[in-house]
Amino acid sequence: MTTPPVYAVGDIHGQFDMLQRALRQIEKDGGTDAKIVFLGDLVDRGTGSRQVIECLIEGQARGRDWTVLTGNHDDLFVGFMDSGAVHDPRVKSGVPWHGPRIGGLPTLASYGIGGLDRDPAALWDDARRAVPPEHVEFLRDLPSHLLSGDLLFVHAGIRPGLPLEQQNRDDMMWIRGEFLEDPRPHPWLVVHGHSAVEIAEHRGNRVNLDSGAGYDRPITAAVFENGGVWTLDAFGRMPLEPIDRQTM
């Protein structure tokens, strides 16, 4: 029995032009009715965060079969918009949201906010006027995951060994080591981003589609169909085979 393909797009990080390229690749392969899951981290670092959010809102409004998941960067942006907070205890390094490592300032600049070297309180005051409330609510309401058959789409990963109903939303946005280093099979093939790699990886129990758009590397789009996994480029599908566990 064949099942319809499901497409996924890795971390976007404000790279609007790259997002458009990924959407063209998907449309070429699956048409305008393609089911697409966006794995979160829509904002920060790149210059087009506003355009990315607008594109996804408009696509859903047109009836596209698009599911947009939340990422930790999206959650940090909502936190800033709610309270002006630039520090979050979940950021273990302690670096602020508006600093270069997390990359919040380009997000504000995409909304026309200038004077980015000002105090965060002044930036927050401008942001509350410049950022449409519907953008904040869109990000706030994003789901943490999507289960589609034997595929689990999520931004960062899951806590191994826990059933889905016991998974923590913060883990799904933030987890790394405990998930990435566990080679055991999960009940599903987990499709995630969050932890940047040079190119997409299939690790047998998980597929990582964060190919580093936050560091000016290309966004990865992939297709999952009848147990197979392919990445997409301008020429079509490229098989993404599991890496031998001995190399993990």
Language model regions located:
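N-terminal active-site segment of His-dependent metallophosphoesterases
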Residues: 1-55
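A general structural motif
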Residues: 3, 31-34, 63-65, 149, ...
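Residue-level marker for buried hydrophobic side chains located in beta-strands
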Residues: 8, 36-38, 68-69, 152, ...
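Active-site environment of divalent metal-dependent phosphoester hydrolases
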Residues: 13-17, 44-47, 73-78, 160-161, ...
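Short, glycine/charged-enriched secondary-structure capping and boundary segments
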Residues: 21-24, 51-54, 82-85, 167-168, ...
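Intrinsically disordered, low-complexity terminal extensions
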Residues: 37, 230, 240, 244-248
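Active-site neighborhood of divalent metal-dependent phosphoester bond hydrolases
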Residues: 46-141
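Acidic, His/Gly-enriched loop-helix segments that form or flank divalent-metal centers
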Residues: 102, 106-208, 212-218, 224-240
